[in-house]
Amino acid sequence: KYIQPGRKVSLEREVFPKLVEEGKLFGYVFDGLWTDIGKAEDYLEINKILLDSLRGRHENVIKGDVKIKEPVFCDLSATIGEGSTIGPYAVLGKNVSVGRNAHIKNSVIFSGVSISDDSLINGAIIGENVVVGKRVKISSNCVIGDYAVIGDNVSLAEGVSICPAKEVFHDVSESKCVI
């Protein structure tokens, strides 16, 4: 009734005014932190704020020749290979596996992700159960959907989105959605 199929709609400018007119829009007083995370950079920014609030309040159980640059949150089940650098502003979910000499910063890595040796991830959101090959470079504001595969030696330009379960074996040199 309020949202027409097949076209973009602005909730704030189109739907909310109609709901107000009909007396169907209600509010809730909330004392906590709230932010709009409709874009990748917004989601990453709120993660920075949350990680800053955790600084010094958690322990990382990371062993060996691994560099941690706080703030970082690593699930206890995450494994990180020798020579890798995690952070600042990195989140590693459950059962994330990071290979040797990988570098991850300003990124959120969801559960079950496998990141191979010598990969560089900076400012990305990587969905669940993604496989990242060796020597991969993922640039800022990239979003990788669940179950995607990024092959060895692939570079993704800033702002690339990869749809879920998509396999990518060639560089993506411009900001676009890979379907």
Task: For every predicted segment, state its role.
Residues 100-179:
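Glycine-rich hexapeptide-repeat left-handed beta-helix
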Residues 50-76:
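Long, charged amphipathic helices and adjacent flexible linkers at domain junctions
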Residues 80, 86, 95, 145-151:
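Tandem repeat scaffolds
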Residues 1-56:
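Catalytic-core segments of class I nucleotidyltransferases/pyrophosphorylases
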Residues 27-30, 58-59, 108, 162:
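Cytosolic beta-strand hydrophobic patch enriched in CBS
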